[in-house]
Amino acid sequence: MSALERANELSDAEDHTQAIAYYEEAADAYALLKEERWNMLMCVFNLGLCLRQADRLDAAIGAFARALALAEDQRTPFDTERERKTVQCKTHDELGKVLADKQSFTESLHHFTTALDIAKTMRDSLELQGIIRRHMANVLEDKGDTDQALAVCGQALEDLQTAGSEPYEIHQTTVDLATVHIVRDEHATAVDLLHEAINGFESLPGTEFAIAHARASLANALRFLGRFAEAERQYALADTVFRRSGRQSSIAYNLQNSALNYAEQGKWEAADRTYSEALSKFEELGVSDYETGRTLMNHSETIRLAGDPERAEEVCRQAIAALNRAEGAGGLVGMALTVLGCCLKDQQRLPEAETALMESVRLIEQNEGSAYSLAYAEMDLGVVIADQCRFDEAAPHFERAREEFLRCGMHYEANLVNREEADALQRESERAHDAEKKDALLVEALSLAVRAAVDADERRFQFPASDARMRWIQRVAEPSRELALSLAADAQDAGLVSELVASWRTSGVVSPSSGLERARGGDPGRPPHHPAQATVPITGVMATDAENGVGGVGSVEGLGDPSGGVRGSANAAGRSIGPNLVMPHGSRSTLSAYAPDLALRRKVKYR
């Protein structure tokens, strides 16, 4: 048996490490024989496939580049010109995929476009065009161009169906289309498509691995719908297959997403453990600095929310170092600096936190990062400046954060800014000596706090599962209510206090005796000279958004203590108030109904 035959046999058995050795041996032999250009082409092309499976991406790019040069060389014999063009298309396609693995998206799209242009010159090439478009859609999605990704992937599915392609290709394209819908926050649609694909795969032989990848994507969609237990089951089913097959990269990425699922439930220990295992595998595989840095950043945020800001800072600095080595990761470095700023804030190293957050804003702007990333950085910067008793400087940052969130249609997050600013205004009012200024500050704070609290209360209807609804009430609605009641008490507005309590008692957010002592009597030590009145109606605030399922929860800010309580407004340590949930960067994971007003974001996905 020749080295090439043995390599092909090992490749079919998915023993990629041994196959690579035999392909390299065969390639060395063919390089000495000019008349063996065709065999040399097949050898280096298959070598590239195995190298990619082994996550040796640079070597894979080199192998495919050699294959492309041979396919374009007129001295390489082909039976027909169509055969030559087909090989060129497939080689450009493989180059596009491996470059996408390295996050070299511009180069990747160039190869897919070239492949598609060649395919269009061939008759009866609709199936080939569909496959190329499917891969192109994946890259467009990774770049954040989800409108184009949806159009291209939809066209790919139509091409394959029209061409009468194999069911496997159609089901795989359905999975990819579902992934685009996940990124677009159209999660119910994604769930339906993924169930359809899984059912289709199950009727075909040899599709266990494809089913596992579909389950991993299904888990992502379920996670975004707040159906964490179902997501956990799907991640576990996928993990079993991945480990049995020995696909280390699939194991690693599945662990990464599973860690997000744990973190969003506040299962910090499980999330920490799972992130650590994923990162260990990333190191073994030599995964890109971009992906490693992004995962380290999410891990850091989880550690911070678990109450260990010192360790979180250490991990976050590792993330920043990795991202600084990555190509085109400036915007992500800015996001990591947002997390670092929060770690420093939690340690009361406020000047350092301010410096980190200012640099975060600069980098996100400079690299044309997402509006929501900029908004989080601006909000956190406002918090840190306000915590240093410089509210006048903090106010423009709160305003910009609110504007950016609203521009993205992220109404919950805009109310998160309202809550932060209300807390800062309350503390500012406590420092004010002029009675009229104190009253004016309380009026403004109360307006913002009531708006945020009513919004948080109404969003409980977005949760079909009782455990998720209670988590929302305990970690979001109750802390928001406490701040609003505290401010109403400061303003000595007994009518507002009564209306708030009656409204939330009816909705089940408060019990008749939960935390109302201060609200009933106020703080006699700090009465305003002239009682302030609320400027926001109690009913109907943000109702249309809640009814439409707008917004999400969770924040880069972390917000609140692990038990979901609220720290006293005069104590800036460990702030701020709100949900103690993870908002992983680059994944925009949330705990609400995950409605379509959320901004675009990049996700790890399965193809």
Q: What residues fall within each predicted segment?
A:
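Alpha-helical solenoid repeat scaffolds used for protein-protein interaction
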Residues: 298, 310, 317-325, 330-333, ...
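Conserved alpha-helical positions within TPR/SEL1-like repeat arrays
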Residues: 4-12, 39-53, 83-101, 127-142, ...
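Amphipathic alpha-helical segments of tetratricopeptide repeats
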Residues: 27-31, 66-77, 114-124, 155-165, ...
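Inter-helical turn/loop elements of alpha-helical hairpins
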Residues: 11-21, 51-66, 70-71, 101-106, ...
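Short, charge-rich amphipathic alpha-helical segments embedded
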Residues: 28-42, 124, 505-518
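Alpha-helical segment of the N-proximal tetratricopeptide repeat
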Residues: 2-28
